[in-house]
Structure formats: C-alpha cells, structure tokens
C-alpha cells in the first residue's frame, strides 16, 4: 500500500483512505454493490475512498480535487499490482450508497473505486482497443 500512500495529490492534501477487504463476509457485502460474476471471484479488494472535506479546492472555481487525487492513487495501486504479476480492474460503476452503508463510511468519505486484485486465471491477456496516438495528441 506504500505505492498508494506515496502518490501525489493536489497541494499534498492526501485526501484518501483505503479499505482492504479480505474477509468472506465483507467480500459478500461488497459484491452486492457490483453484482457481476467475475467480480465475486477476486481474493482481495481495495476500496479507494476520498475525503471531500479535506481535499484541495481550486480557488478560481472551487473545483474539489478529491476525485482526481483518488484517481491518481488508484492507478498507482493498479500499476504496482501489475508489476507483481497481479491482475486488477478499476471498477467505478457500483452502488455508492450501498457501498457506504455496507462499509459503514462517514458522510464525508466517498468510495470512488473498487479494485479487485488477484492472480490472473489465464496467461492470455486480451488487450482492449486503443486509439492511435495521432487521435489523442496534438502539437502546437
């Protein structure tokens, strides 16, 4: 979890908390938030949460950077796991209210991602289609 702890954040506010879900009873509760069969098979989950009250807010438009900071640390976790040969998936299409209730989270703590982690069942990895570099980069 050091990879997450050391991730950069706006003005170094570090507005994140992480819940490592390992127990079968808690995994069953978490699975109700995102009822996909493949999701229930992971041995461990990390729920990435942010505290919107302490996150930095841009003074020009008051934009809260909690989600951005949480996204940065989520990707740090995914990259570190891949380096160790582990598979991950960034899940953000889950029932947030149910997740908050099942994990007994305070009102100011928002779960933004659930990362199932485990060793891939298959060595074959199907790459998703990616845009060509000239479709996403412009030089001025």
Locations of the language-model features?
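Small-aliphatic-rich amphipathic alpha-helix that forms the alpha element of a beta-alpha
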Residues: 4, 46, 61-102
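Residue-level "edge-of-site" marker
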Residues: 17, 94-96, 113
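Short, charged/polar surface micro-motifs in flexible loops or helix N-caps
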Residues: 21-28, 52-55, 96-97, 121
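Helix-adjacent hinge/juxtasegments
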Residues: 35-70
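Structural motif
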Residues: 43-45, 88, 110-112
């Amino acid at each position: 979890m050091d990879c997450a702890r050391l991730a950069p954040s706006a003005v170094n506010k570090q507005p994140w908390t992480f819940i490592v879900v390992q127990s079968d009873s808690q995994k069953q509760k978490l699975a109700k938030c995102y009822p996909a069969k493949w999701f229930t098979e992971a041995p461990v989950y990390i729920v990435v949460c942010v505290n919107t009250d302490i996150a930095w807010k841009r003074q020009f438009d008051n934009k809260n950077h909690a989600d951005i900071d949480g996204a940065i640390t989520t990707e740090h976790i995914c990259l570190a796991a891949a380096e160790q040969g582990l598979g991950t998936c960034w899940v953000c299409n889950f029932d947030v209210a149910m997740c908050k209730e099942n994990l007994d989270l305070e009102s100011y703590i928002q779960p933004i991602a659930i990362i199932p982690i485990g060793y891939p069942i298959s060595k074959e990895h199907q790459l998703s289609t990616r845009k060509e570099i000239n479709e996403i980069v412009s030089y001025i």
